[in-house]
Amino acid sequence: RNGNSDLLCNEFMRGAAEAGHQVEKIFLKDKHINYCTGCSVCSMYGKPCPQKDDAAEVVEKMIAADVIVMATPVYFYTMSAQMKTLIDRCCARYLEIKNKEFYFIIAAAEESVPMMERTIDGFRGSSTAWKSPKNAAPFMAWMPGKWAR
């Protein structure tokens, strides 16, 4: 909380709220989301994921949303483990995450646009599994006043 990705997310939310949109921020670190175990209950049998954690609640909100903003700091050249874990857990309902407009907010400690682009590539790769995604230009920042789109 209160890190660069959080501050950037706050600004995005402020603009969306001022434009009349309903917004909600979810801190993945406050959620209990287990790793996908590859049990195939969802993919082979079409049943809900058997894990009892907060993933179903977050994925349900993603399905209901028109716009999804995924914000993450860059940890060791990619998105945070919490973000990747959530994306993996979307597997059970990925066909329902359709026609969404995605925004990606990336914050890094060093000025390396190629490093941040690798993180964006991870998001874009995941979002191609979802039906008809509309990926907006990413927002990347590193030091105060230093950013790129």
Language-model features: locations:
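Glycine-rich phosphate/pyrophosphate-binding loop and the adjoining helix
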Residues: 13, 18, 121, 127-149
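Short histidine/acidic/glycine/proline-rich micro-motifs that form metal-
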Residues: 1-2, 74-77, 109-113, 143-147
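N-terminal beta1-alpha1-beta2 submodule of the flavodoxin-like/Rossmannoid cofactor-binding fold
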Residues: 1-71, 75-93, 134
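Short, surface-exposed alpha-helical segments at coil->helix boundaries
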Residues: 6-10, 116-121
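Cofactor-binding loop segments of dinucleotide-utilizing enzymes, especially the Rossmann-like FAD-
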Residues: 28, 106-109, 141
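Short, conserved loop/helix-junction motifs that constitute active-site signature segments
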Residues: 93-99, 130
